Swiss-Prot record:
Disulfide bonds join 82-135, 165-249, 191-244, 196-207. Residues 165-167 are annotated as: CNP motif. It comes from Rotavirus A (isolate RVA/Cow/United States/VMRI/1988/G6P[5]) (RV-A). It is found in: Virion; Host endoplasmic reticulum lumen. Keywords: Calcium, Capsid protein, Disulfide bond, Glycoprotein, Host endoplasmic reticulum, Host-virus interaction, Metal-binding, Outer capsid protein, Signal, T=13 icosahedral capsid protein, Virion. Pfam families: VP7. Gene3D superfamilies: Glycoprotein VP7, domain 1, Rotavirus outer-layer protein VP7, domain 2. One of its GO terms (cellular component) is T=13 icosahedral viral capsid. Calcium-binding protein that interacts with rotavirus cell receptors once the initial attachment by VP4 has been achieved. Rotavirus attachment and entry into the host cell probably involves multiple sequential contacts between the outer capsid proteins VP4 and VP7, and the cell receptors. Following entry into the host cell, low intracellular or intravesicular Ca(2+) concentration probably causes the calcium-stabilized VP7 trimers to dissociate from the virion. This step is probably necessary for the membrane-disrupting entry step and the release of VP4, which is locked onto the virion by VP7. The keyword Methyltransferase does not apply. This is Outer capsid glycoprotein VP7. Residues 1-50 form the signal peptide. InterPro entries: VP7, VP7_1, VP7_2. The lineage of its organism: Viruses, Riboviria, Orthornavirae, Duplornaviricota, Resentoviricetes.
Length: 326
């Protein structure tokens, strides 16, 4: 009887000892595998350059900062630059080779030949109807004219911002603007815009909805009109739809691949609609020269500093899409 008990105890001790030995062996083996794997990983990491797949976000600045002219060290091999100028510039310079000359000068600033495009427009009114901004970076030169100051301000507001627009059926519906970013943009060869505000009973306030002659005229006749009315109030509209298209638009934010360079004038135009805010000057700058050769020389000299205030975008601005984001 006692022999059986001793045998059982001996077997138990032997099993415990054997199990302990097996566990220690497994532990040493796992440590060996882990340490060896880590050693190999460290060695490979020092020999292989890992690729970082992060996004390189552009940094934009403000033109309130004074910029010095300099040559950009890194060429813009993969970027395109569009320079928009009025026809009077080419007429004044009267040089058939002026574009080639400027292309060679842009080359000294890191812009390869063929990456800079020169786009001519007739005047501010004509450019307002068909502003096509297709390049990675777009610089628009606008000659200051006191008689066209408001047209210049509206055009700058249009091209310096992104707008999400929807069609308006003014024959069937009343419309209201919901907030300050909500505007009605009219564009065409001749736009006359009249509005009649309505009360809660849809009766005209100071006007008759059945008689457009009693409507208030907010624009006549213009090629580009950005209409701002009292928010939260329904309006009946009358627009010369035969020569003009009107859309209900929401300002989404700045279009950072566009900059406007005002040529002449005492001050930079204020393109803000809100009279209580500080005038917007970012990507809106001024060159104070009389001759167009001097204007273009200055643009070439400072082009890379101007580009630093902008961000490269893949979207284009095309009036046929009426400023939809694409």
């Amino acid at each position: 009887m006692y022999g059986i008990e001793y045998t059982t105890i001996l077997i138990s001790l032997t099993s415990i000892t054997l199990l302990n030995y097996i566990l220690k062996s497994i532990t040493r083996m796992m440590d060996y595998i882990i340490y060896r794997f880590l050693l190999i990983a460290v060695i490979l990491a020092t020999m292989i350059n890992a690729q970082n797949y992060g996004v390189n976000l552009p940094i934009t600045g403000s033109m309130d900062t004074a910029y010095a002219n300099s040559t950009q060290n890194e060429p813009f091999w993969t970027s395109t630059l569009c320079l928009y100028y009025p026809v009077e510039a080419s007429n004044e310079m009267a040089d058939t080779e002026w574009k080639d000359t400027l292309s060679q000068l842009f080359l000294t600033k890191g812009w390869p030949t063929g990456s800079v495009y020169f786009k001519e427009y007739t005047d501010i009114a004509a450019f307002s109807v068909e502003p096509q901004l297709y390049c990675d970076y777009n610089l628009v030169l606008m000659k200051y004219d006191s008689t066209q100051e408001l047209d210049m301000s509206e055009l700058a507001d249009l091209i310096l911002n992104e707008w999400l627009c929807n069609p308006m059926d003014i024959t069937l519906y009343y419309y209201q603007q919901t907030d300050e970013a909500n505007k009605w943009i009219s564009m065409g060869s001749s736009c006359t815009v009249q509005v009649c505000p309505l009360n809660t009973q849809t009766l005209g306030i100071g006007c008759l909805i059945t008689n457009p002659d009693t409507f208030e005229t907010v624009a006549t006749p213009e090629k580009l009109v950005i209409t701002d009315v009292v928010d939260g109030v329904n309006h009946k509209l009358n627009v010369t739809t035969a020569t003009c298209t009107i859309r209900n638009c929401e300002k989404l934010g700045p279009r950072e691949n566009v900059a406007v360079i005002q040529v002449g004038g005492a001050n930079i135009l204020d393109i803000t609609a809100d009279p209580t805010t500080t005038p917007q000057t970012e990507r809106m700058m001024r060159i104070n020269w009389k001759k167009w050769w001097q204007v273009f020389y200055t643009v070439v000299d400072y082009v890379n500093q101007i580009i630093q205030t902008m961000s490269k975008r893949s979207r284009s601005l095309n009036s046929s899409a009426f400023y939809y984001r694409v």
